[in-house]
C-alpha cells in the first residue's frame, strides 16, 4: 500500500540517499582488487629471461639443436594453447575467475622451474605444455576485474590492468638486457629472476577477492525496484518518464549491467546455472554477432593477422640467431622487445586521435598496413643484417598493435560485455586453429619442417595474401558506398525535372 503525501516523498528521498551511498561505497571498493590484479599482472610479466629463451635453449645450459627447438619444441605451445583455450574459456567463467588466475600463476612457476632444471627434449616439450596452460588461462586475468567493479569503471580498470602487464614486460626486457650486456650475468641467472617474479605474482593472486558473479554461468538478470515513482535500476535512480526511456544508450545500459551488482534486500538462494541454457545462449549470440558484415570483416582480419603475428613473434628469436649467433656476438633481444613494446604503446595511444570513416575505409586501411607488415617480415628475412632485422621487427610490432587496437574498438563498439567476451574468444580460437595448421605444415618435424628463413618467407607471403583479400573486399565496399551516394542524387534530379 502506498503512503500518501510528504511521507511518500521522504521515503523516496531516504531510499535514494541509501542507494547513492551504496553506489559510492561500491565505487570506492574498486581500488583494492584493481591494485592487487595490477600487481599480479606486473610481476607475472616481469620475466627478464623471456627475450633470451632461444639462445638459452641452444646454449650450453640445455644444449639442444636448432631443429629440436624450432621444429619439435616450440610447436607444442601452439597445440596445447589451442586444445586448452575453449575449456579454459568456459571454466574461467564457471569457476569465477580467481581459481584460474591461480592456475596461471602456478603454471608459470612450473614452467620456469623446469626451464631451470629440466633436461632433454621430452622434458622441454612438457615445459611448453605448461606454458600453453599459462597462456590459455591469461583470459582470467583480463576478465576477472569486470566481475568486481561497477560498469562505469570498466574503461579505467581495463587500462590499468593492461598497462601493468605492458610495464612489467618492458621492465623485464630492459632489466634482462642490462644484466646481460652490462653486468655480464648468465642466462641461467635471468631465469632465476623470472622464477622469483612469477612466484611473487602467484602469492599476490591469493589475496584477490573471490568474485560472486560472472558473465555467463553466474549472471544475474537486471534488478529493478520501485519506491513511489522512483525507479531504482542497477544501483542508480532513474525517473520513470517516457522521455527517460528513450534517452540515447538506455537499452545499452540495460544490457550491460555490472557484474558485482548488490543483491536485492530480500536474499534468495542463487539458482544453479543451467549449463545447456548457457551454451544455447552462447550459440545464439555467436550467430547474431557474426551476421553483421562490419564485425565479420574486422573479426576475419583479427583471426588471420593474429595467427601470423603469433608465428613471427614465436620464431623471430630463431631468425635472429640464424643471422647473428649469440655465441659469437652480443645480442640485444631484450632492448628490441622493450623498444617495440613502448613504441607500440605510443601507437595504441594515438589511435584515439585518428579521425576516419572506418565503415568506408576500414578494409582499405587493413589492406595497406597488412602489406607493410608483409614488407617488414620479408626484409627481416632476406637482409642478412641483425640491425635491419631488429628495425623490421619493431615496425612489424608497432603496425600490428595499432591495427589490433582499432579492430578491438570497432568490434567492441556496439557489443555488450558478454558478447564481446564471446567474440574475443572465438576470434582467438580461430587464430590458434589457423596457427596450428600453419605450424603443422610448415614448422613441425612431422610436416615439412622447413628452415627458419623459408618459414619467414612463407609468413611474408601470408600477410601479402591478407592484404590482397582486404584490398579486393575494400574496393567492393567503396564502390557500393559511392553508388549509394549517387543514387539519391540521380533520383532527386529526376524528381526536379
UniProtKB/Swiss-Prot annotation:
Glycans are attached at residues 63, 314. The gene is SLC19A2. GO terms for cellular component: membrane; plasma membrane. Pyridoxine transport is inhibited by carbonyl cyanide p-trifluoromethoxyphenylhydrazone (FCCP) and carbonyl cyanide m-chlorophenylhydrazone (CCCP). It is found in: Cell membrane. The lineage of its organism: Eukaryota, Metazoa, Chordata, Craniata, Vertebrata. The chain crosses the membrane at residues 29-46, 73-91, 100-118, 129-149, 166-185, 192-208, 286-310, 338-354, 364-380, 387-409, 420-443, 456-479. Changing residue 112 to Y: Loss of pyridoxine transport. This is Thiamine transporter 1. Residues 47-72, 119-128, 186-191, 311-337, 381-386, 444-455 are extracellular. Residues 1-28, 92-99, 150-165, 209-285, 355-363, 410-419, 480-497 are cytoplasmic.
Amino acid at each position: 500500500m502506498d503512503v500518501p503525501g510528504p511521507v511518500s516523498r521522504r521515503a523516496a528521498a531516504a531510499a535514494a540517499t541509501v542507494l547513492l551511498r551504496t553506489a559510492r561505497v561500491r565505487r570506492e571498493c574498486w581500488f583494492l582488487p584493481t591494485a592487487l590484479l595490477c600487481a599480479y599482472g606486473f610481476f607475472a610479466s616481469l620475466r627478464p629471461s623471456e627475450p633470451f629463451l632461444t639462445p638459452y635453449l641452444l646454449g650450453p645450459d640445455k644444449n639442444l639443436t636448432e631443429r629440436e627447438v624450432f621444429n619439435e619444441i616450440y610447436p607444442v605451445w601452439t597445440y596445447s594453447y589451442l586444445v586448452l583455450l575453449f575449456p579454459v574459456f568456459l571454466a574461467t567463467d564457471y569457476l569465477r575467475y580467481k581459481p584460474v588466475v591461480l592456475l596461471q600463476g602456478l603454471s608459470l612457476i612450473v614452467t620456469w622451474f623446469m626451464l631451470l632444471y629440466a633436461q632433454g627434449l621430452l622434458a622441454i616439450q612438457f615445459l611448453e605444455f605448461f606454458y600453453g596452460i599459462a597462456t590459455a588461462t591469461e583470459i582470467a586475468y583480463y576478465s576477472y576485474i569486470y566481475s568486481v567493479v561497477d560498469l562505469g569503471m570498466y574503461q579505467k580498470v581495463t587500462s590499468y590492468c593492461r598497462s601493468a602487464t605492458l610495464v612489467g614486460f618492458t621492465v623485464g626486457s630492459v632489466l634482462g638486457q642490462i644484466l646481460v650486456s652490462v653486468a655480464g650475468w648468465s642466462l641461467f641467472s635471468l631465469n632465476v629472476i623470472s622464477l622469483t617474479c612469477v612466484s611473487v605474482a602467484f602469492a599476490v593472486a591469493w589475496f584477490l577477492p573471490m568474485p560472486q558473479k560472472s558473465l555467463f554461468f553466474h549472471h544475474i538478470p537486471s534488478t529493478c525496484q520501485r519506491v513511489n515513482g522512483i525507479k531504482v535500476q542497477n544501483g542508480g535512480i532513474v525517473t520513470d518518464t517516457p522521455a527517460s526511456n528513450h534517452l540515447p544508450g538506455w537499452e545499452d545500459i540495460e544490457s550491460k549491467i555490472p557484474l558485482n551488482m548488490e543483491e536485492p534486500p530480500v536474499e534468495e538462494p542463487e539458482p544453479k546455472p543451467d549449463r545447456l541454457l548457457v551454451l544455447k545462449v552462447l550459440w545464439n549470440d555467436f550467430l547474431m554477432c557474426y551476421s553483421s558484415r562490419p564485425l565479420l570483416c574486422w573479426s576475419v582480419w583479427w583471426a588471420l593477422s593474429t595467427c601470423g603475428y603469433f608465428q613471427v613473434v614465436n620464431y623471430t628469436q630463431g631468425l635472429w640467431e640464424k643471422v647473428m649467433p649469440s655465441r659469437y656476438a652480443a645480442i640485444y633481444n631484450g632492448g628490441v622487445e622493450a623498444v617495440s613494446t613502448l613504441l607500440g604503446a605510443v601507437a595504441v595511444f594515438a589511435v584515439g586521435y585518428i579521425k576516419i570513416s572506418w565503415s568506408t575505409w576500414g578494409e582499405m586501411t587493413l589492406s595497406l598496413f597488412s602489406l607493410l607488415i608483409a614488407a617488414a617480415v620479408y626484409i627481416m628475412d632476406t637482409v642478412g643484417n641483425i640491425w635491419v632485422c631488429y628495425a623490421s621487427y619493431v615496425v612489424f610490432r608497432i603496425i600490428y598493435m595499432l591495427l589490433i587496437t582499432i579492430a578491438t574498438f570497432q568490434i567492441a563498439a556496439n557489443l555488450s560485455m558478454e558478447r564481446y567476451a564471446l567474440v574475443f574468444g572465438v576470434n582467438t580460437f580461430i587464430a590458434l586453429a589457423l596457427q596450428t595448421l600453419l605450424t603443422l605444415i610448415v614448422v613441425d618435424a612431422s610436416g615439412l619442417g622447413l628452415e627458419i628463413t623459408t618459414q619467414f618467407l612463407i609468413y611474408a607471403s601470408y600477410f601479402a595474401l591478407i592484404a590482397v583479400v582486404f584490398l579486393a573486399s575494400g574496393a567492393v565496399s567503396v564502390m557500393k558506398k559511392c553508388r549509394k551516394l549517387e543514387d539519391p542524387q540521380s533520383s532527386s534530379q529526376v524528381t526536379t525535372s
